[in-house]
Amino acid sequence: MSTTRPSQSSNNSGRSRNSARIIAQTTVDAKLHATFEESGSSFDYSSSVRVSGSVDGDQQPRSNKVTTAYLNHIQRGKQIQPFGCLLALDEKTCKVVAYSENAPEMLTMVSHAVPSVGDHPALGIGTDIRTVFTAPSASALQKALGFAEVSLLNPILVHCKTSGKPFYAIIHRVTGSLIIDFEPVKPYEVPMTAAGALQSYKLAAKAITRLQSLASGSMERLCDTMVQEVFELTGYDRVMAYKFHEDDHGEVIAEIAKPGLEPYLGLHYPATDIPQAARFLFMKNKVRMIVDCNAKHVKVLQDEKLPFDLTLCGSTLRAPHSCHLQYMANMDSIASLVMAVVVNDSDEDGDSADAVLPQKKKRLWGLVVCHNTTPRFVPFPLRYACEFLAQVFAIHVNKEIELEYQILEKNILRTQTLLCDMLMRDAPLGIVSQSPNIMDLVKCDGAALFYRNKLWLLGATPTESQLREIALWMSEYHTDSTGLSTDSLSDAGFPGALSLSDTVCGMAAVRITSKDIVFWFRSHTAAEIRWGGAKHEPGDQDDGRKMHPRSSFKAFLEVVKARSVPWKDFEMDAIHSLQLILRNASKDTDIIDLNTKAINTRLNDLKIEGMQELEAVTSEMVRLIETATVPILAVDVDGTVNGWNIKIAELTGLPVGEAIGKHLLTLVEDSSTDIVKKMLNLALQGEEEKNVQFEIKTHGDQVESGPISLIVNACASKDLRENVVGVCFVAQDITAQKTVMDKFTRIEGDYKAIVQNPNQLIPPIFGTDEFGWCCEWNAAMIKLTGWKREEVMDKMLLGEVFGTQMSCCRLKNQEAFVNFGIVLNKAMTGLETEKVPFGFFSRKGKYVECLLSVSKKIDAEGLVTGVFCFLQLASPELQQALHIQRLSEQTALKRLKVLTYMKRQIRNPLAGIVFSSKMLEGTDLETEQKRIVNTSSQCQRQLSKILDDSDLDGIIDGYLDLEMAEFTLHEVLVTSLSQVMNRSNTKGIRIANDVAEHIARETLYGDSLRLQQVLADFLLISINSTPNGGQVVIAASLTKEQLGKSVHLVNLELSITHGGSGVPEAALNQMFGNNVLESEEGISLHISRKLLKLMNGDVRYLKEAGKSSFILSVELAAAHKLKG
């Protein structure tokens, strides 16, 4: 679907467009499915995809009915695959409420004979499941019934009472019942007995290790590695990685296949090939297996007394739909295994350490798909391993996406800077006449500038006459917008789109002025698509009616032949930024030719100045380092100690005077020399290592205590030219904790004396047995987390104790959960982990950051019986020292210098303007001229005062001093209105001043400049929120209250009423301090409200039908005279 939208973009608009696209695509999926069901064997795939792609508005009611029926069909299917059987239970009674037709035969019969009574229980509606399995199996199932997160227990190994056959019971909960899939354990399998996450890691350990060892920066390498590892792990004939594009169509981006199979790498297919409903199911059930697409499905029989239909969406056995089976058969794929790749939604905000904030929203990035030309069954443990591997893969995909965005943003910013530099020399023609040009800003095939009725063309663009038609069409049909973007000019309604289709079909355009426009163009998507599919033999011919990859590719090209690659939000943000730069450049050109080149050069070449301020910061840093309660030392580029604070002198017994001048390597233990040498060399190259452990020698009376163990962060010290001149080491003393861990290592068996010791030196320790159940939780963990020992013991450590949902200690996100699982599983296999960053939310919602070390636990025979986990917490002093280190970064200083420089440069021309106004005041002016000069003077005073606001925190916290003077409301109103008249005239908005004359002329006492600043801000925001041609009304009321004999307190209330839908909710939330200050409007509103608070006032915002109002209140004093 084409999207025509203003050239601004936001998270909310992105999400709403995404939702609208999904709804529309689901409607198309439903129609296509209905056509397939009606047509049967005569179904024509290619024509159906083309027809369903165009949704007629008149058919919408019918589409809704079709969609509802389709979704109900998807969710309420009543068939399963025959490789296993299914039971649905009433949780309260353990009785069967639904079963698959093959369940009695698989679970209760020794042979195909009719079941007998006694030892061979019959299975049907109302059967108690505990009578079907052996006592231990029945007990395990009984325990699962009361388990909150029942899926954490999967798979449960059970044995039939009748035959003794082993099955994996895979359980999930749906509304009203518990559904259990039973998959037979094959004779060649070693039955899985531990929790799925622990055992499955062993199967996928090699693949996970290889993924984690890959260098970042290449999505192609990551995907190629993933399909290679899955190919080796599962043994399928073909493994592919699918990626879903923004318009939901798919692409095969990586593939590995056995010789002789047709390659699908590079294949694109329409969005309808994988319907939205199927994608939703992949988000819920992340691994899906089809054993044999030709197998006959088995019906599920349900108790007729149940008041609802069971849904099998979460079942591992759920039967695929006939449409999908036919597609598989047509491409000679008999069996498949599909893994969902779920990543963070880029439209969402980042993670927060606040416990009350929701988790990041997820989206289906793509799929890892395995195909086989013969039936293939993959046991559940291996499928679980694949799911775990897919989660690790998704984490790395997420990182690659973030890295790609960072690189793109960096390139865009670099291009914007260069374009801005060109504008300083030649605005606006520099963006098309020099290099780089506007085509380098975003990916496009052509661009054009329409300026002062002349055209400049770059790359593939429409002709000049066609461009003039587009500009005329925009002026007629998009008058209210500052621009638009579309991936299809035809869908956007441009009459001449058909004549352009061979050249371009997507366009982004923004206005510099009402008549000047910048264009970017894209050709149709099909022009960029190449698929190196297998060549046809002479005489072969495709049957486009069949559902097949070749038909999909052909159908995709048909769908996108008049559509370009969509414009991404970050691309539109870059375009909009350039638009603002061009607008400002245009205004500057029309008003005055300032020497902007000199200013820009000065800004770009700006170095850190103001040595006094730098020296003050340095002195404060030195004082903090010397008095810090954590050990801190520093060395120069040669490794010679030039900093040695009181704490490290106390720990080592080496005074400051003796330490200074010694080489660092002579002060550390021999076993730590290589570690320190590597850390020092990396830091001198600018690579600052964190959480490195080494041991340092002791001296004097401290020698008998042995060496000091430190956890150290390196921080490179740099001069003004960014050259590394030394290294500072901020450390934490962990000698006591290391002593405990060493003692633990030496003790074999009797660990409880340490683990359960209440001594404060004992670090937080917890553990798990070999099956994944929490078996240790010491006093330090109770204090740290707020969870008692009895509340966590015998719960699943992964999922119940530490998890992302409904767990005791909530982890920040899915990535943290997966990484924690990897660390635990590595230790279970003998690979111990030391000091990895770890974090979780305590019972009270506080986020705890620490270092995690994991060691295996062994019995007398040397067998691994579980793992121990040790936490090391950073001391408050260390956290403070690191915080100070971050605050002293040179980036912050540079920004401060840039801001100081710009404010200084503004003051000089402002002083000239003030001087000119003063000169005018001394001349013989008429009354109206004097009024205009006075208004200008008030605006200049307001600007000067704002430039003095160097401490916004002071305003926000209420520490600003007000300048009190006599004034009239009339003066404030005139000055405030003058600041918004240009904007109101541009939009054709009438400003009605309904303030009564006696109120306007009342002499008041207060800070008039701050009042006019606030009033101008609220007027501007009201005008921006008012539709073109609307009206803004300002009114006032005034009440007096006598304080003593001579002073009157004035309560002034100003109302600004405007039409339209109102100020955006996000800006209002920022005004009241409910959200992080992000937008310019939000910051302005927030500061204005704080200024009102300083004047003992506040602001309210009222919404009514068709209009909204700001109500501003302030307290002032009244004088005794009226000004005429």
From Swiss-Prot:
Low complexity bias: start-end ranges: 1-19
GO biological process terms on file: detection of visible light; red, far-red light phototransduction; regulation of DNA-templated transcription
Keywords from the named record: Chromophore, Photoreceptor protein, Receptor, Repeat, Sensory transduction, Transcription, Transcription regulation
Binding site for phytochromobilin: 323
Annotated PROSITE patterns: HIS_KIN, PAS, PHYTOCHROME_1, PHYTOCHROME_2
Posttranslational mods: Contains one covalently linked phytochromobilin chromophore.
The Histidine kinase domain, residue ranges: 901-1120
Keyword Cell inner membrane (UniProt): no
UniProt entry tagged with the keyword Repeat: yes
Sequence ranges assigned to domain GAF in this UniProt record: 218-401
Molecular function in Gene Ontology: phosphorelay sensor kinase activity; photoreceptor activity; protein homodimerization activity
UniProt xrefs under InterPro entries: GAF (IPR003018), GAF-like_dom_sf (IPR029016), HATPase_C_sf (IPR036890), His_kinase_dom (IPR005467), HisK_dim/P_dom (IPR003661), PAS (IPR000014), PAS-like_dom_sf (IPR035965), PAS_2 (IPR013654)
Residue span of region Disordered: 1-21
Superkingdom of this protein's organism: Eukaryota
Domain PAS residues, every copy: 617-687, 750-821
Complex formation: Homodimer.
Family membership: Belongs to the phytochrome family.
NCBIfam families the UniProt entry points to: sensory_box (TIGR00229)
Annotated function: Regulatory photoreceptor which exists in two forms that are reversibly interconvertible by light: the Pr form that absorbs maximally in the red region of the spectrum and the Pfr form that absorbs maximally in the far-red region. Photoconversion of Pr to Pfr induces an array of morphogenic responses, whereas reconversion of Pfr to Pr cancels the induction of those responses. Pfr controls the expression of a number of nuclear genes including those encoding the small subunit of ribulose-bisphosphate carboxylase, chlorophyll A/B binding protein, protochlorophyllide reductase, rRNA, etc.
Protein name: Phytochrome A
Organism this protein belongs to: Pisum sativum (Garden pea)
